Amino acid sequence: MKIFSILLVALIICSISICTEAFGLIDVKCFASSECWTACKKVTGSGQGKCQNNQCRCY
């Protein structure tokens, strides 16, 4: 049971790491969220993004 708990915690930590690195800020300057849609589509395959602190964030 102790080994199962350790494996479960390791799996959760790895999953969080993978999910947070998958999407995020990309190196594209912007002034409006609509400028990020095409850039995010090219990088992540999804057109979901917004302009945050003059930099595109993709979801």
From Swiss-Prot:
The keyword Disulfide bond applies. Pfam families: Toxin_2. GO terms for cellular component: extracellular region. InterPro entries: Scorpion_toxin-like_sf, Scorpion_toxinS_K_inh. Keywords: Calcium-activated potassium channel impairing toxin, Disulfide bond, Ion channel impairing toxin, Neurotoxin, Potassium channel impairing toxin, Secreted, Signal, Toxin, Voltage-gated sodium channel impairing toxin. Residues 1-22 form the signal peptide. The record marks Y59 as: Aromatic residue of the functional dyad. Expressed by the venom gland. The record marks K50 as: Basic residue of the functional dyad. Disulfide bonds join C30-C51, C36-C56, C40-C58. It is found in: Secreted. GO terms for molecular function: ion channel inhibitor activity; potassium channel regulator activity; sodium channel regulator activity; toxin activity. Gene3D superfamilies: Knottin, scorpion toxin-like. The record marks T38 as: Important for the inhibitory effect on KCNMA1 channels. Coiled coil: none annotated. Has the structural arrangement of an alpha-helix connected to a beta-sheet by disulfide bonds (CSalpha/beta). Alpha-KTx 16.2: inhibits large conductance calcium-activated potassium channels (KCa1.1/Slo-beta4 KCNMA1/KCNMB4). It appears to block channel activity by a simple bimolecular inhibition process. Shows a fast association rate and a slow dissociation rate of binding on rat brain synaptosome. Significantly inhibits voltage-dependent sodium current and voltage-dependent delayed rectifier potassium currents. Belongs to the short scorpion toxin superfamily. Potassium channel inhibitor family. Alpha-KTx 16 subfamily. This is Potassium channel toxin alpha-KTx 16.2. It comes from Olivierus martensii (Manchurian scorpion).
